[in-house]
Design a protein with these regions (language model features):
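Acidic, glycine-rich active-site loops and adjacent beta-strand->loop/helix elements
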Residues: 134, 188-189, 279-282, 304
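Active-site microenvironments in enzyme catalytic cores
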Residues: 4-6, 37-239, 254
Length: 315
């Protein structure tokens, strides 16, 4: 199933599930008699709630069906937590080499020496991540808003995982049963700011990642049963219709199962948490030193998940 949040005729955020061969949406709010009010409620409701949605979708009343075409889709849900991982070694290699080549002259030599050693061996020993901000979540029809410090504004195409089952100390072999589904994620980044935030005196990414609409997810939340092999999904980025890069989740240095297992070490994971798997190689502008201009339309696609297009606007 594919879960969406859309605006009803009164402008209210409304949960729905895609039906009729991806041509229509079942309004879950009205079809459930007001019992289902958000997609997060479905995620937190577990198997019983999914069964209820399946029953509603199997016998929908015509009055609860709306055409998908023309609907304004919001972010499918607002996650209760956001962890953003980096598990693509090639992305790091290409990014650091680009910074070494193009960034501040006084750092070129030093950065290049670092770049040829990136990633360090610790990168392969365990997955690394930072905490994101869920208040900056935006959806597939929202704008990318350039922050005041966004001279080098960039996109990052990522596969995101939504947790559907509570768990702690989850073994990799059991990780899949804790997944509710998957999303396309654009981890919008202000690179100039990030250059100042990833140095030795920094606690990690901050304002370079945290600004309005910087975490764009969509177009829908696809349940895990519709994604038989999330570790082998092809993906691409287009800017103004031009293909900027193509990649695959098969290039991860740590699997989704390993990421979930590591995250749950000494800590309980809860339904509704979002785990982003990191920027795919060739699918962010910094690697080729091509950044976004106002008016650009950025389209992110992951086969089997979906695609979304967002326009860059000045802040």
């Amino acid at each position: 199933m594919k879960f969406v949040t859309f605006r009803d005729p009164k402008g209210r955020p409304t949960p729905g599930v895609v039906v009729d061969g991806n041509s229509a949406v079942l309004d879950l709010l009205t079809a459930s008699g007001g019992q289902i009010t958000t997609v997060l409620q479905v995620v937190e409701g577990g198997p019983a709630m999914l069964d209820k949605v399946r029953d509603l979708a199997a016998n929908p009343g015509a009055e609860h069906i709306v055409a998908l075409d023309g609907l304004r889709l919001e972010a499918p849900l607002r996650p209760v937590q956001l962890r953003s991982f980096s598990v693509y070694a090639l992305h790091l290699e290409r990014s650091f080499r680009a910074v070494a080549k193009h960034h501040w002259n006084k750092l070129k030599s030093l950065l290049f020496k670092v770049a040829i050693k990136i990633p360090p061996k610790q990168f392969f020993e365990r997955p690394v991540y930072y905490k994101g901000t869920v208040t900056n979540i935006a959806g597939p029809h929202d704008d990318i808003i350039r922050p005041p410090y966004g001279e080098k504004l960039d996109y990052e195409l990522e596969l995101a995982v939504i947790i559907g089952k509570k768990g702690k100390a989850i073994a990799p072999a059991d990780a899949e049963e804790h997944v509710f589904g998957y999303l396309v994620y654009n981890d919008v980044s202000a690179r100039e700011q990030l250059f100042d935030e990833v140095g030795p005196m920094s606690a990690g990414p901050a304002k370079g990642k945290d600004f309005d609409n910087s975490n764009i997810i969509g177009p829908w939340l696809v349940t895990r049963d519709e994604v038989p092999d999330p570790m082998n999904l092809k993906a691409r980025v287009r800017v103004n219709g031009e293909v900027r890069g193509e990649s695959s989740t098969s290039m991860m240095s740590h699997s989704i199962a390993e990421i979930i297992a590591y995250t749950s070490t000494g800590e309980t994971l809860y339904p509704g948490e979002m785990i982003a798997t990191g920027a795919m190689p060739y699918c962010c502008g910094i690697e080729d030193w091509k950044f976004l201009n106002d008016g650009d339309e950025v389209r992110l696609e992951i086969d089997g998940i979906g695609q979304m297009t967002n326009r860059v606007v000045p802040g």
